[in-house]
């Protein structure tokens, strides 16, 4: 019997985490926790007060914690979406300590401009707004952390998601810190973003 799995679905804003996870996540009953969706749902339900945004964040965080606790108790697989920017290893380390295998699915975009464009399209369709400076910060931080922490995951798949209305292209697989398949060197924009991975 295999260990339960944590699947981290990572990438910058607009990379397609929510749109494509159903195509890319291994077949299971696991529905990835979408923090942004929970936040937006709570935000819209709250009355307009000064601390409305913070309250919505607190409620979304509570939702995440509750679902994680339930997964731990039942030893079920768990998945969540993240920009992989702030404390990216906090939850993976917690799951590892609980005996979970760590899987990372990372979606790449070839520019910050494309990320901003997709955020604006999402806003036009009822999604949440993210300021340009925050999109840029998350873009670089996500790649920096991928380059830094990739060896701590048991299994990683990296995808290129810049093409419009197409399922992302598989670029690399990493198993226990060892690159077993890679076309990363074909993508010039990745050269300075994940140099450690490309050199493997």
Task: Tell where the protein language model's regions lie, with residue ranges.
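Phosphate-binding P-loop
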Residues: 1-3, 71-72
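Short hydrophobic/aromatic beta-strand immediately N-terminal to the Walker A/P-loop
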Residues: 6-8
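The conserved Walker
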Residues: 12-13
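Conserved glycine(s) of the Walker
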Residues: 16
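Conserved substrate/cofactor phosphate-moiety recognition/catalytic segment
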Residues: 21-74
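Glycine-rich phosphate-binding loop used to anchor ATP phosphates in small-molecule kinases
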Residues: 56-106, 142
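A glycine- and Lys/Arg-enriched "phosphate-lid" helix/loop adjacent to the NTP-binding pocket
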Residues: 100-146
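NTP-dependent small-molecule kinase module
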Residues: 149-200
């Amino acid at each position: 019997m295999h260990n339960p799995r944590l699947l981290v679905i990572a990438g910058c804003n607009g990379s397609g985490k929510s749109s494509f996870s159903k195509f890319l996540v291994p077949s299971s009953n696991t529905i990835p926790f979408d923090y942004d969706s929970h936040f937006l749902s709570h935000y819209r339900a709250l009355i307009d007060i000064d601390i409305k945004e913070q309250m919505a964040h607190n409620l979304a965080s509570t939702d995440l914690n509750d679902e994680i606790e339930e997964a731990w108790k039942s030893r079920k697989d768990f998945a969540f979406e993240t920009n992989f920017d702030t404390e990216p290893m906090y939850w993976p380390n917690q799951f590892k300590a609980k005996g979970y295998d760590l899987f990372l699915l990372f979606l790449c975009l070839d520019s910050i401009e494309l990320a901003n464009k997709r955020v604006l399209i999402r806003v036009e369709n009822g999604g949440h707004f993210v300021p340009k400076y925050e999109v840029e910060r998350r873009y670089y931080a996500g790649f920096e952390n991928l380059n830094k922490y990739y060896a701590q995951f048991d299994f990683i798949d990296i995808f290129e998601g810049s093409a419009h209305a197409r399922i992302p292209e598989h670029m690399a697989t990493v198993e226990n810190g060892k690159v077993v398949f890679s076309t990363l060197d074909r993508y010039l924009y990745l050269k300075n973003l994940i140099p450690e991975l490309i050199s493997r």
